[in-house]
Amino acid sequence: MKQCVRGATMAIALNMAGGALAAPGKPVPYWASLSQDEARMRVGPSLDYPSNWVYRRRDLPVKVVQVLGLWRKIEDPDGAQGWMHVRLLSDTPTAIVKADAAPLRQAAGDGAMALFRAEKGVVGRLSGCASGWCNFDVKGQRGFVKADQLWGATDK
């Protein structure tokens, strides 16, 4: 019985610490994304510090620029910096369209047929980037986008 309780306590503790979220031990800077529908950026690495931003956009890409315990200093796509708890972050590779409009193409190449267009500010998931092109998924609409039209985990 003690063994079962001890195991459950350990599982809960690992889950609360964020498990494999936000790449502990990874050299900075590195890419992460928001794992929650709402996430607060704070002016310092503690719940005692006030929030300077509240994000309401799951999968928004962020760049982790500093690590302090369970806190990550992040930079958002607009350049704002602040601190977030590791539980609010994920290693899911995402990006945001920074061009006015980015065609999602059937294949990686300028001559490939454009399937969709993603407007500036659209967030999607990445499933790989190579030779200047990224496989970009926006809520099930998939295509290849030029990496220089995106901000996020395009260097993986």
Model-derived segments and their meaning:
Residues 21-43, 54-58, 65-142, 147-156:
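SH3-family beta-barrel domains
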Residues 11-15, 102:
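Repetitive helical segments and hydrophobic/amphipathic motifs
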Residues 48-52:
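Short boundary/loop segments of OB/S1/cold-shock single-stranded nucleic-acid-binding domains
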Residues 1-9:
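Bacterial N-terminal signal peptides that target proteins for export
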Residues 9, 43-45:
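Sequence-pattern detector for short linear motifs
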Residues 17-19:
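N-terminal signal peptide c-region/cleavage motif recognized by signal peptidases
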